[in-house]
C-alpha cells in the first residue's frame, strides 16, 4: 500500500513537470565581447510588446543566460551592459516546448 502511494506521488510530480515544460518555451544563449571572451553580468530583458511585460536575467560567470518558462508569443530581447552598445532583437517567436538559442556579441560604445 505504501509503495503504491509513493508511486502515485512520484507520477503526479513527474506529470506536473512534463505539463509545465510542454506549455512553455525557453530562450538561452551566450554573450561575448568583440574578442570572443564571454561577458558575465550582462542584463538580458525579455519584453512582450503585446502585454508590455518584461522579465530580466543576468549572464553568469560563463556569459550564459537562461530565461525558462516563457509563454508562447512574439518577444523582443534587449541586451545591456555599461560600456557597450545596447542590442535589441525583435520578432523572437517562442512556441510551446521550444528551446531557442540566441547568442550575442557586444560592441564597445555607449549604452
For each feature predicted by the language model, list its residue ranges.
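Periplasm-facing N-terminal accessory domains of Gram-negative outer-membrane beta-barrel systems
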Residues: 2-7, 13-111
Amino acid at each position: 500500500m505504501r509503495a503504491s502511494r509513493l508511486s502515485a506521488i512520484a507520477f503526479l510530480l513527474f506529470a506536473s513537470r512534463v505539463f509545465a515544460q510542454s506549455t512553455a518555451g525557453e530562450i538561452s544563449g551566450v554573450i561575448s565581447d568583440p574578442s570572443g571572451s564571454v561577458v558575465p553580468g550582462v542584463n538580458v530583458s525579455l519584453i512582450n510588446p503585446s502585454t508590455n511585460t518584461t522579465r530580466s536575467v543576468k549572464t553568469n560567470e560563463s556569459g550564459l543566460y537562461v530565461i525558462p518558462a516563457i509563454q508562447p508569443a512574439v518577444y523582443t530581447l534587449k541586451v545591456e551592459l555599461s560600456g557597450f552598445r545596447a542590442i535589441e532583437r525583435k520578432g523572437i517567436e517562442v512556441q510551446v516546448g521550444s528551446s531557442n538559442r540566441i547568442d550575442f556579441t557586444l560592441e564597445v560604445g555607449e549604452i
